[in-house]
């Protein structure tokens, strides 16, 4: 089970920053862009989002709340953009950054999203992004996200337990290779729509395995 990933020998090592592509969406200059690159982060800045697909290859997305998402014509701006990205790419890590205050009405758009204040210094930016990397590279955290999604798809608990065991086996014994997940045996017990959901979820994950 997922508890097998908690043993001392399975302590997660520090993830390499340059393994994780990061997109920053901001219509203004991002002050610490070059400094973060010098600190080892692989970051590209976009002034806005033309569509959701342009962020397909980025496991981490950091978005300003104001001034972006114009093509989507939502008064919620960046918050709406983040919500739509989360629907399409639920296993990515998201952060929204803004000034000292923001309209609390957007809280429903930012469930599970890290909030970063614009006025923090470079040291704090490094900490925030390292936390985002940890969030998407820890195998246990990734499984818990997958499990929540599958529960919402009404996958039965027996199938979930079987998938969890197979997931853990891949982490412990197959170096995180998810090309055959779920296995042919498991596939036959899953609804085709659910199988497609599982395969789409694991397609883009980058786990920090030993």
Predicted regions span which residues?
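A short, hydrophobic beta-strand element within the central beta-sheet of small alpha/beta folds
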Residues: 80-108, 115
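Short acidic, S/G/P-rich loop/turn micro-motifs used as interaction or catalytic elements
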Residues: 28-32, 49, 65-73, 100-104, ...
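Conserved acidic segment of CheY-like receiver
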Residues: 12-29, 36
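C-terminal output/effector regions of signal-responsive regulators
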Residues: 144-210
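Conserved sequence signature across two-component system core domains
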Residues: 24-27, 46, 61, 85
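A short, well-structured beta->alpha microelement
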Residues: 36-57
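Receiver (REC) domain switch/output surface
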Residues: 121-156
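Conserved phosphotransfer microenvironments
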Residues: 58-89
